[in-house]
Amino acid sequence: MNLEKINELTAQDMAGVNATILEQLNSDVQLINQLGYYIISGGGKRIRPMIAVLAARAVGYQGNAHVTIAALIEFIHTATLLHDDVVDESDMRRGKATANAAFGNAASVLVGAFIYTRAFQMMTSLGSLKVLEVMSEAVNVIAEGEVLQLMNVNDPDITEENYMRVIYSKTARLFEAAAQCSGILAGCTPEQEKGLQDYGRYLGTAFQLIDDLLDYSADGEHLGKNVGDDLNEGKPTLPLLHAMRHGTPEQSAMIRTAIEQGNGRHLLEPVLEAMTTCGSLEWTRQRAEEEADKAISALQILPDTPWREALIGLAHIAVQRDR
């Protein structure tokens, strides 16, 4: 199923999600409204709330509470973006100035905290202790992932296992929670819940692998952020690690230095040349496709419906995207 058909299938639910986001973002504090609306209206993909919507419908849910789960998932994602951009000192996201560039670091951190806590208020309104347990653990793991990534900056010697732990924690865990919590809310079987959980984990991993690939292969204007940001920040992502470990001694030394010292955007061209020589981007995409295939396989426990087909379609779209 292509994105157009997925959007048609989820149009009513996603309209409810967007309305809930705007309603729950409201505050008596003007700066919260201004900054919150600024980042929420930034044109994100909304893939995480879409997963929540589709997962609930795929196991036969007929109510409306899944809209709340989808909205709070987007809130948690948005709060992490606000904090990420402060930590990374980023100045562009989704083709416009980051919130920290537009409003300052302090405002971004504090409004991010407001959005986090509003998400937990929304969780308690659902009346499900298990959803609260899964989501609170997920947010804790996400925070750990961000700290792990910070520890890995400028370290060219991290293992692939360490890298995969980071992307599971900071990205895939929220995908996993989105699918799992919708299943819990819908009262699905334990086997279906496990299938949805696995789907989210594998899809989130594939999604982040492609994100890391696009940092070196996409057009900056199309991508909506600066190409080579990871290199400039000294982040040892999978494409970079692959090129360092399979390049010539000269290429490996150059990449190692770029990771250790950061501020390596001027080395982007020779780094890309090394990646081309080593097939690093193709290898990373292949790894992402393997994760997407595992996500699709995890859905076999679900009944054959358009909702399941849409979840399968999202897995294909996640690895075929160019931004």
Regions found by a protein language model. Give the residues of each.
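All-alpha prenyltransferase/terpene-synthase fold signal
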Residues: 1-323
